[in-house]
């Protein structure tokens, strides 16, 4: 299998062949990462924001990997590309109304409205309108307090409040 790595502008940075030590870790309401091990003949100038698209999801470098120079001609890499979940832990959750951005608020509504809040924040952070809500449980209105928390914490708080789970497939939040 060949894996294409792009810079944050979408330009091809490298094409690599991951070895058998490469893994994907993905859990409902948990970690989502792609650890890729490979050897190249040239050093690769990785940068934060480089990404790979794998099985319909985008995985992004949040730290720059350091190569191990195995010989004068070989470089061994083991970068860890993170799913959107890790990016959400770095993004403050805002109530986005009338151009205002409030990070300390409470919302009384059903699960769909709370998920809409998260999707709006993901689209804000990613600079897109690609993210959407998938199927949502039916439930009565409940109060969720967003007291200066990040989007990942907010998602977990919503799930706890409505006694359910969340997960992401592609650019859809369920």
Where would I find each of the regions flagged by the language model?
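Short, acidic/charged, Gly/Pro-enriched secondary-structure junctions
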Residues: 1-9, 39-67, 97-124, 156
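Juxtamembrane "anchor/assembly" segments of surface/extracellular structural proteins
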Residues: 1-47, 79-88, 94-107
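Solvent-exposed loop and beta-edge segments used for protein-protein assembly and interaction
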Residues: 28-30, 71-73, 149
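Charged- and aromatic-enriched interaction segments used to assemble
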Residues: 76, 82-174
């Amino acid at each position: 299998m060949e894996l294409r790595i792009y810079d944050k502008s979408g330009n091809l940075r490298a094409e690599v062949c991951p070895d058998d030590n490469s893994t994907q870790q993905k859990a409902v309401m948990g970690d989502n990462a792609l650890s890729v091990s490979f050897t190249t003949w040239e050093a690769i100038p990785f940068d934060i924001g480089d990404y790979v698209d794998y099985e319909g999801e985008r995985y992004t470098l949040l730290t720059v990997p350091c190569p191990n120079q195995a010989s004068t001609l070989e470089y061994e890499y083991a970068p860890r590309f993170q799913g959107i979940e890790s990016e959400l832990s770095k993004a403050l959750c805002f109530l986005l109304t009338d151009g205002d951005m409030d990070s300390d608020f409470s919302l009384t509504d059903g699960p769909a409205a709370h998920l809409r809040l998260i999707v709006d924040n993901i689209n804000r952070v990613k600079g897109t309108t690609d993210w959407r809500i998938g199927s949502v449980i039916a439930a009565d209105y409940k109060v969720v307090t967003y007291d200066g928390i990040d989007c990942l914490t907010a998602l977990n708080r919503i799930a706890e409040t409505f006694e359910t789970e969340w997960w992401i497939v592609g650019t859809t939040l369920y």
